[in-house]
Amino acid sequence: MHYQNVRAAKFIDRPNRFIAHVELDGSVETVHVKNTGRCRELLVPGCTVYLEKGTNPNRKTAYDLIAVEKGSSLINMDAQAPNKVFAEWAAAGGFLPDVTAIRPEYTYGGSRLDFCVETEGRLHLVEVKGVTLEENGNALFPDAPTELGVKHIRELQRAAETGLDAVLFFVVQIRDIHSVAPNDATHPAFGEALREAAAHGVRVLAYDCDVTPDSLKIRREVPVIL
């Protein structure tokens, strides 16, 4: 996926989950943050961030904050991007060969899962999780407690137990990650649910991405450590 009209800026602060203050062209600009997660380890005063200019002239903020530099790494932190890049990748045959349909926001049981991917005679239920938390080259999810994430995992487990192909798919919005693991220190229940689901047939996959200031693309599979 690609962004348009991307600018570099310097991060100042984040007064709430939705906006941040940045320095752009010598002036302070209020921008929309496309990720309501904590991201405390990413948005550090003085770091370089990347902004996409919005196309709606009537919106309150002119720019969206989409990526941030952390050391030598560039991290895409757009919470909407993982689903978009998965859909592009799956449509191009990256997920499975012979895909006949990709249905987003698929209702199954009591949940709405991100995708139902159809191949000849079979349904594949996919829940996508974007990962931006990195420690020493390894990625962790979640960066904050997510009861909805636990609910999605349990729904995938029920699907797997009926014989459907159920997949939890981590899109790591960083390049050259060594592994992905549940962040048990932050949300033990998520890790417990994930390990139980995997033991009952849910496939747990993770892929890192090629990241530039104006693009994101799924790159290669990385190990998941449960």
Regions found by a protein language model. Name each.
Residues 137-147, 154-186, 208:
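Nucleic-acid nuclease catalytic cores
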Residues 9, 113-143, 156:
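Conserved catalytic cores of phosphodiester-cleaving nucleases, focusing on short active-site segments
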Residues 13, 53-58:
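Short, charged beta-turn/beta-strand-edge "cap" motif at the junction between a beta-strand
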